Amino acid sequence: MKLHELSDNDGAAKKRKRVGRGPGSGTGKMGGRGIKGQKSRSGVAIKGYEGGQMPLYQRLPKRGFNKPNRKAYAVVNLGLIQKFVDAGKIDASAAITEDALIASGLVRRKKDGIRVLAKGDVTGKLNIEVTGASKSAIEAVAKAGGSLTVTAPVAETSEA
């Protein structure tokens, strides 16, 4: 086998059909679109328009609500914090603050604060200070002999 002998399998590369290129091509003049009307033009139909029938998006009831002052927390699991402590990326002798979690690379952005959840095992004594935590996370840290303190989020001051 040589490079110049290589070719696609039969039917693998389908030739493009050039439409509207004269009567001799077989797909000239109307180009397979039929005669006149909106569907024969480019752009075809208006999205969501159902020909005068009440459109689906109007037939269904409105639902839901977006809370304007919703808090978005960066979520961290206890198992990950323990993993970073074991790897030496977080110093467990001092209090583990939100700034320490960001500096270690465990959390990229703080958002409205950091919330700790109980997934994973805690083997050592950890003293954690964060904006939010689940009840089970607080219990798990206390069971391991540490403390999980939930602090009030710091309000961002805007300079006008």
Swiss-Prot record:
Residues 21-35 have a biased composition (Gly residues). InterPro entries: Ribosomal_uL15, Ribosomal_uL15/eL18, Ribosomal_uL15/eL18_sf, Ribosomal_uL15_bac-type, Ribosomal_uL15_CS. GO terms for biological process: translation. GO terms for molecular function: rRNA binding; structural constituent of ribosome. Residues 1-42 are annotated as: Disordered. Keywords: Ribonucleoprotein, Ribosomal protein, RNA-binding, rRNA-binding. Residues 1-13 have a biased composition (Basic and acidic residues). The keyword Endoplasmic reticulum does not apply. Pfam families: Ribosomal_L27A. GO terms for cellular component: cytosolic large ribosomal subunit. Binds to the 23S rRNA. NCBIfam families: rplO_bact. Part of the 50S ribosomal subunit. Belongs to the universal ribosomal protein uL15 family. PANTHER family: 50S RIBOSOMAL PROTEIN L15, LARGE RIBOSOMAL SUBUNIT PROTEIN UL15M. This is Large ribosomal subunit protein uL15. It comes from Roseobacter denitrificans (strain ATCC 33942 / OCh 114) (Erythrobacter sp. (strain OCh 114)). The lineage of its organism: Bacteria, Pseudomonadati, Pseudomonadota, Alphaproteobacteria, Rhodobacterales.
